[in-house]
C-alpha cells in the first residue's frame, strides 16, 4: 500500500530483441540495433510506472476510442480473446459512467503474481494461475482501478476502502448493466 502524487515519466529501456515490454507508458520510439531493441515511453500524470518484460508474451490488442488496450499472456486461446473483449466493454462502460480515461494505452498483463491482480497507472497485473472466470473478474476489478485509485487517487493506507470499494462496486455496476450479474 502507498500514497502517491502524480508525476510525468519518461523511460528508455534497451532489451534483447526477443523480449516484449509491457509498461505503463505510451510508446514514443523504437530503435532496433542488431540483437537489441531500445524502447522509449512517456506517461503524463501517472501515480506510478510499472513494466513487465518477457520473451514468451503473446499480445492481443483492441482499440477503445483513443485508447489502445493490450492483453499480454503466455499463450493465446479463446479465453484470451473473451477476456480482452470483456475488458474493452467494461472499459467503455467505465469511461461513459465515470469520465474519460486519461492515458493513450492500457495494458493487462498475465504474470506469476500470487493471486488476483494489482493496478498501476495504465497497466495492471492479473495472476496467470487463476481459472478463466477468476482471471476475467480480476482483470475487470483492476481495470476499474484505472478510475479509482489511479485517476482519482486516495490514501491507500488509511483509506483503502475508497478505491477498493469503488472498484468492486464499479465492476458490479458493469456486470449488472450488461446482464451478467
What are these regions (language model features)?
Residues 2-140, 169:
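Hydrophobic helix-coil surface modules that form long, contiguous segments used
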Amino acid at each position: 500500500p502507498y500514497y502517491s502524487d502524480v508525476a510525468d515519466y519518461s523511460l528508455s529501456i534497451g532489451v534483447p530483441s526477443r523480449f516484449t515490454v509491457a509498461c505503463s507508458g505510451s510508446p514514443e520510439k523504437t530503435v532496433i540495433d542488431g540483437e537489441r531493441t531500445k524502447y522509449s515511453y512517456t506517461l503524463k500524470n501517472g501515480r506510478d510506472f510499472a513494466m513487465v518484460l518477457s520473451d514468451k508474451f503473446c499480445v492481443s490488442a483492441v482499440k477503445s476510442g483513443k485508447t489502445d488496450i493490450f492483453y499480454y499472456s503466455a499463450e493465446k486461446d479463446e479465453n484470451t480473446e473473451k477476456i480482452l473483449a470483456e475488458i474493452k466493454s467494461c472499459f467503455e462502460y467505465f469511461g461513459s459512467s465515470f469520465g474519460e480515461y486519461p492515458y493513450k494505452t492500457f495494458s493487462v498483463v498475465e504474470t506469476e503474481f500470487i493471486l488476483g491482480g494489482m493496478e498501476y497507472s495504465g497497466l495492471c497485473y492479473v495472476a496467470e494461475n487463476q481459472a478463466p472466470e477468476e482471471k476475467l473478474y480480476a482483470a475487470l476489478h483492476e481495470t476499474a482501478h484505472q478510475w479509482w485509485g489511479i485517476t482519482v487517487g486516495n490514501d491507500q493506507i488509511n483509506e483503502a476502502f475508497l478505491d477498493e470499494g469503488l472498484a468492486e462496486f464499479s465492476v458490479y455496476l458493469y456486470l449488472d448493466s450488461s446482464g451478467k450479474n
